């Protein structure tokens, strides 16, 4: 079997209000979804935990989808033929903030989001693809939709989850079970504390 990747563009528009970045020229923003069809038995996927326990299509492939955004020169021939991939921690797009000294935005589109144009003046394509399956929608976060791994009887795979709490201030006496409103917390399998 062969893995398949399909990028479905749902939005295409000028980036940075059509501003030209030196010899590279203007940029455009492509937004959409990437559809992955993965062979769970392939050597490259061997270390993906429980991938072999996800539902498969008739050809034996496992499917998932991720948000994707690309900033690229309108004329690719004027670019440097290099791609900068920002994995986007917790669904956020940070590369322009850190490399272009731009204001942070999960919806980069304006001249302010281009900042000093560091990537653009050098001709890079900048790409974000969601990679965390526990993010909730909101604030333009990148989302990844993954299948649920299941036991042979069809029930979801469950197990012990351990959490480490770090005290970061003197006098702290309690912690929320999930400190991130952007992350999906899975419900407890059982509320029986004797287990």
Indicate where each model-derived feature is located.
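C-terminal His-loop and adjacent cap/lid subdomain of alpha/beta-hydrolase
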Residues: 2-195
């Amino acid at each position: 079997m062969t893995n398949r990747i399909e990028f479905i563009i749902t939005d295409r528009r000028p980036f940075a209000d059509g501003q030209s970045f030196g010899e590279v020229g203007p940029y455009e923003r492509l937004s959409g979804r990437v559809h992955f069809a993965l062979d769970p038995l392939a050597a490259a996927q061997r270390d993906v935990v429980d991938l072999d326990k996800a539902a498969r299509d008739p050809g034996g492939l496992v499917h998932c989808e991720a948000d994707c955004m690309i900033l690229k020169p309108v004329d690719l021939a004027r670019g440097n033929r290099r791609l900068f991939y920002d994995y986007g921690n917790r669904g956020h797009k940070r590369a322009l903030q850190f490399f272009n000294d731009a204001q942070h935005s999960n919806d980069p589109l304006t001249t302010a989001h281009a900042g000093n144009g560091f990537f653009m003046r050098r001709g890079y394509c900048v790409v974000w693809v969601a990679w965390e399956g526990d993010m909730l929608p909101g604030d333009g976060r990148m989302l990844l939709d993954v299948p649920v791994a299941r036991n042979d009887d069809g029930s979801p795979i469950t197990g012990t989850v351990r959490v480490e709490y770090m005290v970061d201030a003197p006098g702290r006496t309690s912690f929320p079970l999930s400190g991130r409103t952007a992350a999906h917390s899975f419900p407890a399998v059982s509320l029986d504390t004797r287990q």
